[in-house]
Amino acid sequence: MHEPCGGCGELLDVTNLGPFETAICPICSTETHVKREFGAYRLDQRYAIGGMSVIFVGWDTTLDRKVAIKVLNEEYCNDEIRIQAFENEGRLTAQVSHPNVVKIYALGRAYGRFYLVMELLEGLSFERIMAQRGALPEDEVLDIAIQVAAG
């Protein structure tokens, strides 16, 4: 697979590079980020890193909407057990329809990498809120507990 250099247009071999890895052009030394397209989805920025995957903020080029794209780490892309767990996560979550459960839009594979496309939830995590604010008032904690119990 080849992508053009952002500086001079030279075609760079990016076959073995993962999402957002950098290729350096041998002609002009420009750094080019590669593999931003996963089918109909474009990876725009890293959002979170987990034990088995990286989540990107992306764009659904077909439906013109922001999405979250979870990409299985490259080291697990030949591990059938991890692939199955990743795919099961997507399939099982897609069967749940609840306001407190993220919606799954697609499950796919591109460039040998497995990915899930899901609803992008924006805002602060509970962990971040606690780090910023410390102990929360009882009424807020109860509201959060009710939401957790419902979902």
What are these regions (language model features)?
Residues 44-51, 55:
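Protein kinase glycine-rich loop
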Residues 48, 88, 97-100, 113:
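Flexible N-lobe loop architecture of eukaryotic-like protein kinase catalytic domains
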Residues 52, 98-101, 126:
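Non-catalytic scaffold residues of the protein kinase domain
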Residues 57, 65-74:
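Glycine-rich ATP phosphate-binding loop
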Residues 73-95:
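AlphaC helix of the eukaryotic protein kinase fold
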Residues 107:
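Activation-segment/catalytic-loop signature of the eukaryotic protein kinase fold
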Residues 111-125, 129:
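Conserved short submotifs of the Hanks-type protein kinase catalytic core
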Residues 144-145:
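Activation segment signature within eukaryotic-like protein kinase domains
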